[in-house]
A protein has these predicted regions:
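Acyl-donor (CoA/ACP) binding surface of acyl/acetyltransferases
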Residues: 1-34, 38-48, 81-160
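Generic, well-ordered alpha-helical segments
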Residues: 27, 38, 55-62, 76
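A short helix-loop-beta-strand connector motif used in the catalytic cores of GNAT acetyltransferases and
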Residues: 55-56, 68-83
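Conserved GNAT-fold acetyl-CoA-binding loop/helix
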Residues: 47-68
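Short alpha-helix boundary/capping motifs
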Residues: 62-64, 74, 139
Length: 160
């Protein structure tokens, strides 16, 4: 197994998975400051492959709204928004999300992800994505997971 489910959740986490070097967690609103810091620090790095956001997106108050939506969508089984936290430092270094979750006969979803610029090419996203995909197959019983990747994004193409 590439992950274990941690029942000793902290900081208002709704779900937490541990891998060898990472913690993947659905974070609550009290983490808005740390999430905002991650997004601000990586704004220009993510710009080429991310959707466009205005300046208000990169504020703590706006992130609290997004986190509230994430948590509600997670509770309803519509979204699994896993923030990637480096266990050694406690830093938020990325995110893997599963969305467009279809149940019934379909049992599929899509995934998207991003990583902190300083943590690229170190195997963190490979570790996170392998564990998160295994979790979705095991716990959500997905049959298929599609990755939304722009053809110009060579790193993501190599990852999947």
């Amino acid at each position: 197994m590439l992950y274990d489910i941690d029942t000793r959740r902290t900081r208002g986490e709704l779900l937490a998975l541990n891998t060898a070097r990472l913690r993947l967690a659905v974070l609550g609103r009290r983490e808005a400051g740390r999430i905002t810091e991650y997004l601000v620090n990586n704004r220009s790095f993510h710009q080429e492959f991310s959707q466009t956001h205005d300046d208000s997106y990169f504020t703590e108050s706006e992130q609290k709204k997004y986190i509230h939506y994430d948590c509600e969508s997670f509770r309803f089984g519509e979204l699994v928004p896993l923030w990637i936290i480096e266990r050694e430092t406690g830093l938020i270094i990325g995110r893997v999300s599963f969305f467009n979750i279809a149940y019934g006969g379909m049992m599929n979803c899509a995934t998207g992800y991003h990583l902190d610029e300083a943590h690229t090419s170190k195997g963190f996203m490979t570790e996170a994505l392998k564990a998160a995909v295994q979790f979705m197959f095991n716990e959500y019983h997905m049959h298929r997971i599609e990755a939304f990747i722009l053809p110009e994004n060579r790193a993501s193409l190599e990852l999947v």
